[in-house]
Amino acid sequence: MTTDIHHPEGATGAGAPRLIGLDVTRAIALIGVVVMNYHGFLNDPATGNGRWSRFFHVFTGPLSTRFAATFVLVAGIGTALLAAGTLNKMSGTSHGTLRLRLARRGTVLIVGGYFLNMAWPGTILFFYGAYFLLSALIITLRTRYIAVVGALSATAAVALALWESSRRSAGHSTAWLLPYEIHSAQDLLCRIFLSYTHPVFPWFAFFCTGIILGRNLRNLIHFRTQLTVVCVTILMCTYGLATILSSTGQRDNRVVFVLTTMDPFSHGLFYILSTASIALLAFLIINQTAERFASTKLVMTLRRSGQMTLTLYLAHVLVFYILVKWSDLIGATGLDTSLTFAVCFWIFGISATSLWHHHFGRGPIERLYRLIGG
């Protein structure tokens, strides 16, 4: 096996040490993404209205989009580390070269995601491409300006949600903001920036949060406890206040409801704050646990598989089509089916990709992605 493509589990393609927490977080978050996706397709409305079905509901459940947000946060961290590694490895590398690399990767993802979306509506790859393209514009800015960009993304989402609610209450249609299919440039821009599953407003705020965290990752041990306390406090305040307002009838007010809703498609203030906090907490907990048990077989397996999540993500779509769409071996019979299907895929996928990475290094889709995207 040629060593120029097969790097140790603890090293990046450039030879720099890999951060185990990032890879393990990706591998664990993947099971959540698979569960939510499979449940979204396999939930039978006739049997899927129970408490647990609502809990796992892909659109309205409390877990909806939280796993994907963790992926976006980690992608932001990885982008910050990529930028630092690229500029440090080659001191003569210009900012333009770094921006071009990110733009190439973003273009690959947005084009590939566009076509995948035809078979797998709502795929995050399409939006990932937009995040990378935008990151090419801001990656060399100072951290304070990255924070401003993230805050503007979140603010724009909340402002849009309030405006849309106002228009609907006045009897005006806002359907043009929510194109299910892309037939024009307007549909494309609305899909990327404003609507559907993971639009730039507010999701780029999660990506910017990751960039900021990635730039300060070396000092994480010094502020990890404080950051955890802040995240827990935000969660307690958002969920607690939303519950109190509901019990007192205050959320009957349209503006209050939009600001405090946890519905991911409403893009309210409380949704943004709680989702960012959950993603940060997930990373902090998984990262610390992975570092503590880094030498265990389970963590090593997750570490290898976490470096092949792009391959695993596309594989979960292919497996779904083979077993559900094409052969009808699995049907929409409820939550038990989707959970069993997702867990079986995850166990097999994690084991297979770990074995692949151990023997061959980088995954097949990751190699293609790097070949085209740089």
Regions found by a protein language model. Give the residues of each.
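Alpha-helical transmembrane segments and their immediate juxtamembrane cytosolic regions
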Residues: 2-374
